[in-house]
Amino acid sequence: MATKGGRDKIKLESTAGTGHFYTTTKNKKTMPEKMSIIKFDPKARKHVEYKEMKLK
């Protein structure tokens, strides 16, 4: 049986205001700051910045 890791689920939400988001995991011990990454937004049909938000 797998053990629980130190990774937490997070939501990366588009800053374009389309409401599109990606979910991923990150290790909060090695990366305590909020994640920001440029990914493709299919609703805006261009690459935009995605910022980490709370996963409800």
Curated annotation (Swiss-Prot):
It comes from the Bacteria. GO terms for cellular component: cytosolic large ribosomal subunit. Residues 1-12 have a biased composition (Basic and acidic residues). The keyword Flavoprotein does not apply. Residues 1-24 are annotated as: Disordered. Residues 15-24 have a biased composition (Polar residues). GO terms for molecular function: structural constituent of ribosome. SUPFAM superfamilies: Zn-binding ribosomal proteins. Pfam families: Ribosomal_L33 (PF00471). One of its GO terms (biological process) is translation. Keywords: Ribonucleoprotein, Ribosomal protein. Transmembrane segments: none annotated. Belongs to the bacterial ribosomal protein bL33 family. This is Large ribosomal subunit protein bL33. It comes from Paracidovorax citrulli (strain AAC00-1) (Acidovorax citrulli). The gene is rpmG.
